[in-house]
């Protein structure tokens, strides 16, 4: 049940995915649904099945008034830190909309530096349908990228854990060392680099 219900003609929702992983970009999406989108089943992207997310990914793009998927790269994450890189990705997503939003809801408790009228909403992906839609676009995009990267960098299990620090991933880092898609500013990756330099 979505609680934030202001007039929705040009209200955007923004969310990002990929703060916690040790590898890959952080991906953000911004979505303006409009008042009569008729999309059923919107919910926090982490709480619905992959099959349902994939179906909604297509429906959201077909029916949204406007959407944009953006990112901050591994290099930007290492240079700026993950929080500022996440905010940068969200800012890029909003700037990529082909319609200027009248108001923006951002998932979380921090807003990017911008001049838009906006509000940060904690657990917004379950309270604001535009944020939920953005969450789905960002998660499906990033998950698919990690599956593709798993083929390019085999042995790390990226398709399964999507870059998160699971036991499989941590063991692979120790065994194989990090790749160029690993975030060197994250402690487990730094530790793996230091370990490789010992030999």
UniProtKB/Swiss-Prot annotation:
Localization per Swiss-Prot or TrEMBL: Cytoplasm
Ligand binding (a divalent metal cation): 15-16, 107
Cofactor note: Manganese or magnesium. Binds 1 divalent metal ion per monomer in the absence of substrate. May bind a second metal ion after substrate binding.
Catalyzed reactions per annotation: Endonucleolytic cleavage to 5'-phosphomonoester
Taxonomy, superkingdom: Bacteria
Any one of the GO BP annotations: mismatch repair
Keywords: Cytoplasm, Endonuclease, Hydrolase, Manganese, Metal-binding, Nuclease
Cofactor(s), by name: Mn(2+); Mg(2+)
UniProt EC number: 3.1.26.4
Top EC class for this record: hydrolase
Residue intervals of the RNase H type-2 domain: 9-198
Annotated GO CC locations: cytoplasm; ribonuclease H2 complex
Record-linked CDD domains: RNase_HII_bacteria_HII_like (cd07182)
GO molecular function per UniProt: manganese ion binding; RNA binding; RNA-DNA hybrid ribonuclease activity
Family to which the UniProt record says this protein belongs: Belongs to the RNase HII family.
PANTHER family linked to this entry: RIBONUCLEASE H2 SUBUNIT A, RIBONUCLEASE HII
Function: Endonuclease that specifically degrades the RNA of RNA-DNA hybrids.
Stated name of the protein: Ribonuclease HII
